[in-house]
């Protein structure tokens, strides 16, 4: 690839703002550290936003969708037609993420990167159509080099649109029947971990289905000879359009200075790809939750992430990240609106 924009420097954190936020935390009317992880979140957001008292009024959510050729191997409980049907549900307002976006007063963008329905035309959806889904990675690389680069760029473009619209937080979500298989395959490469330890039920496989899924992945990894040292090759061979777009969006946000809240298993795989491609972007990633897919815990550990929630979620769509937004907003409100000891005339140390 010649256009390696993903290697460009990310926006620097504002260390002065973080120092000021830390000093403010020490003066608020509470024992130091008593708000636990919320205190660190407020300080981190101060550094990301470049101000002592961060706010999260403007949240942008983008759903990236794409179908997966590996579904031909019988690794999903649902037919591929569901991907296109869910696009209609997203823009129609009936999906979980649609409801959450309304409740959060967040913008919601839906990007079709390539479903099996080439005739699909939905108002409110960006149809980019990089292909009729990826190729079956059990037999050949999932994406061509041009498709991979276009998917990364599509994610970056979404991040730049969010930045131009004043977003203070970006959430990427995904939709694609078969994408937990692609994500588990990528995770297996990047973590150097057997697929059987990372594969889960996805949309509802039984135990035999999960075993078959892991066997398909292991066979594909032997075919392609992938290594963690070449994340782009791994992404192109066993990834998905939407996973590549998520990785591009995460790097694009970090370069544009927009904080990212990462959703579940699939989004965390994309985050690990992004960090492999540009380690500087890690500072811009917050992690919403630990989901039910068995590989998610290992991914979070590799990313040194402290998720905010653990609710047994495995829906995707960015839903877990959306559920964590109120926590981030409350962390900012506590940090910005609590009185200091001096303001409240409260003693700042025990008697």
From Swiss-Prot:
GO terms for biological process: cobalamin biosynthetic process. InterPro entries: Nict_dMeBzImd_PRibTrfase, Nict_dMeBzImd_PRibTrfase_bact, Nict_dMeBzImd_PRibTrfase_N, Nict_dMeBzImd_PRibTrfase_sf. The keyword Nucleotide-binding does not apply. PANTHER family: NICOTINATE-NUCLEOTIDE--DIMETHYLBENZIMIDAZOLE PHOSPHORIBOSYLTRANSFERASE. One of its GO terms (molecular function) is nicotinate-nucleotide-dimethylbenzimidazole phosphoribosyltransferase activity. The active site is at 317 (proton acceptor). Pathway: Nucleoside biosynthesis; alpha-ribazole biosynthesis; alpha-ribazole from 5,6-dimethylbenzimidazole: step 1/2. Catalyzes the synthesis of alpha-ribazole-5'-phosphate from nicotinate mononucleotide (NAMN) and 5,6-dimethylbenzimidazole (DMB). It catalyses: 5,6-dimethylbenzimidazole + nicotinate beta-D-ribonucleotide = alpha-ribazole 5'-phosphate + nicotinate + H(+). Keywords: Cobalamin biosynthesis, Glycosyltransferase, Transferase. Its EC number is 2.4.2.21. This is Nicotinate-nucleotide--dimethylbenzimidazole phosphoribosyltransferase. The gene is cobT. It is an enzyme of class 2 (transferase). Belongs to the CobT family. Pfam families: DBI_PRT (PF02277). It comes from Pseudomonas putida (strain GB-1).
């Amino acid at each position: 690839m010649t256009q390696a924009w993903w290697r460009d420097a990310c926006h620097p954190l504002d260390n002065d703002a973080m120092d000021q936020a830390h000093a403010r935390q020490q003066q608020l009317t509470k024992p130091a550290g008593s708000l636990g992880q919320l205190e660190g979140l407020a300080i981190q957001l101060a550094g990301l936003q470049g101000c002592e008292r961060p706010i999260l009024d403007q949240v942008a959510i983008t759903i990236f969708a794409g179908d997966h050729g590996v579904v031909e191997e019988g690794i999903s409980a649902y037919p591929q037609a569901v991907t296109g049907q869910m696009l209609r549900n997203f823009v129609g307002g009936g999906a979980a993420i649609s409801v959450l976006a309304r409740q959060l007063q967040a913008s919601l963008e839906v990007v079709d990167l390539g479903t099996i329905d080439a005739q699909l035309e939905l108002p409110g959806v960006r149809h980019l159509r990089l292909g009729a889904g990826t190729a079956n990675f059990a037999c050949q690389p999932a994406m061509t080099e041009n498709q991979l680069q276009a998917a990364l760029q599509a994610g970056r473009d979404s991040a730049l649109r969010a930045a131009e619209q004043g977003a203070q937080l970006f959430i990427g979500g995904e939709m694609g029947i078969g994408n937990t298989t692609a994500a588990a395959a990528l995770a297996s490469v990047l973590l150097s971990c057997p697929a059987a330890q990372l594969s889960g039920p996805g949309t509802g496989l039984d135990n035999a289905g999960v075993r078959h899924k892991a066997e398909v992945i292991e066979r594909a990894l032997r075919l392609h000879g992938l290594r963690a040292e070449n994340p782009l090759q791994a992404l192109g061979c066993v990834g998905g359009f939407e996973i590549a777009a998520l990785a591009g969006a995460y790097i694009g946000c970090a370069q544009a200075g927009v904080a990212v809240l990462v959703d579940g298993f699939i989004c965390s795989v994309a985050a690990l790809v992004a960090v492999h491609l540009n380690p500087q972007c890690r500072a811009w990633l917050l992690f919403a939750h630990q989901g039910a897919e068995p590989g998610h815990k290992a991914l979070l550990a590799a990313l040194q992430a402290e998720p905010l929630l653990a609710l047994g979620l495995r829906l995707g769509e960015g839903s877990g990240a959306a559920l964590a937004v109120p926590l981030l907003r409350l962390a900012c409100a506590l940090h910005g609106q609590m009185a200091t000891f001096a303001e409240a005339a409260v003693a700042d140390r025990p008697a």
